[in-house]
Amino acid sequence: MASEHYFSASPGSELKTRTIRTRLAGHEVELTTANGVFSPERIDTGTQVLLASVPAPPPGGNLLDLGCGWGPIALTLALESPHATVWAVDVNERALDLVRANAEKMSIPNIKAATPENVPEDVTFMTIWSNPPIRVGKNELHNLLEKWIPRLEPGCDAWLVVQRNLGSDSLHRWLQATFPDEFAFVRASTNKGYRVLRGRRRSGMTGPIGIVR
C-alpha cells in the first residue's frame, strides 16, 4: 500500500514504536524508532557509510539533513555542532515526531524538525548531509535536489550517499549536468556498495576537490 511507504506524509499503519541502541558521534545512545519510517530496525548501511565519510560539520549556521527519517544524521550533526541550527527535513510526519522525541530524550535543543514547506525560504545552509529517498522515483528525486542544493552557502559542501546499484553514478552525472557552473560534484568515497558524492558551491572555493573513481 502506498500509505506504508516511508516517503508518505502520513503512514497509515498503526504506530508501533521500538527502542534501539546505537552509537552516534561517539556517544552510546538509546533511541526510539517506529514502523512506517525508513530503516526502523537500525541505522542503515548507506547512512553508516555517509557518517563515516564526512568531515566534521561547520560549528555554526544552519545545517541540513534532507530526508531525515527518524534522525540519525540530524542527531549526529547536532551533537557535533551544538551551536548550529540543524534542520531535519522530511515529508513523513511520523519520522519528524521521532526526531523530536529523540532530540528531547538526548537533551538536544538545536534541532528543528520540519516538513519542506515549513522551512523558511530565506534559510540557507552551511552543509547538507543526505541519504536521499532514491525510491521516490527519478523525477521526484531530481525535483527535490533542484530545490535544496541551491540553498547551500558559497564555498560549502553537500554530501549525498547513494547505493551504486540504485544509480549513484547516473545521479552524479545528472548533478554535474544540472549544476555545471555553480557547483562542482565529485565522487568522494566508495564503500560497501555505496558512493558518497560531494558537491561544493563554486563561489568561495579555496582548493581542489579530490575524486574517487
Language-model segment annotations:
Residues 1-25, 36, 40, 212-213:
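N-terminal auxiliary segments of SAM/dcSAM-dependent transferases
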Residues 34-52:
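Conserved SAM-binding loop and adjacent beta-strand
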Residues 46-130:
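Conserved SAM/SAH cofactor-binding pocket of Class I
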Residues 142-154:
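A short glycine-rich, Lys/Arg-flanked "PGG" loop and its adjoining helix->strand segment in the class I
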Residues 155-162:
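Conserved beta-strand signature within the Rossmann-like core of class I S-adenosyl-L-methionine
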Residues 163-180:
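Conserved class I S-adenosyl-L-methionine
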Residues 189-213:
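Core SAM-dependent methyltransferase catalytic element
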